[in-house]
Amino acid sequence: MIVYHKDFFVNRLVKEWLSHEKLIIACDLDDTIIPYNPELTDSCTETVQLIKDCQTEGITFIINTARQGSKLSSSVEQVEALGIKVHAINKMPSNWALPIGIAGKVYANIFLDDRGGLECTKHQLRKAFEIVKQFREQQLLQSL
C-alpha cells in the first residue's frame, strides 16, 4: 500500500484524488467562503484561495447550504465572482452516477464547513493538494 502522508485522512484524500483524477469538495457558504461574522473574513479568504488552488488540480465543487431562493441565487453569483467554478448546488452534478445507498446525501471526499472542523479540514485539504501537485509535477518530469 502506498503511503503519501502519515495522516490517514490526508493519505486517503491523496489516494482518492490520484485514482479518480479529481476530488469532490462540498462546501457550506456562511463563514466558510462568504463571511457572515467579520472576524472570520480572513478564514473565508483562505478557504476561497484553497478551493481555487485545488481547482488547478481537478475538483468537482458542490455548494452544500441551507440557503434557498434569491439568497441562494445571489450567493452562487458571489461564489462564482470569487473565481470558483460551481458544479452543483445541494446535489450531485447531473453527469455523475450516484453510488448505491447514499439516499440523497451529497457525496464528497471532503466537506468544508465552519461548524464542522473547518481549520482541520482545510489543513488536510492543503496538504493533500500539495502532495498531488508535487506528484503530478514529478510524473510530468519523468515523462519528458
What are these regions (language model features)?
Residues M1-L144:
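HAD-like aspartate-dependent phosphatase fold
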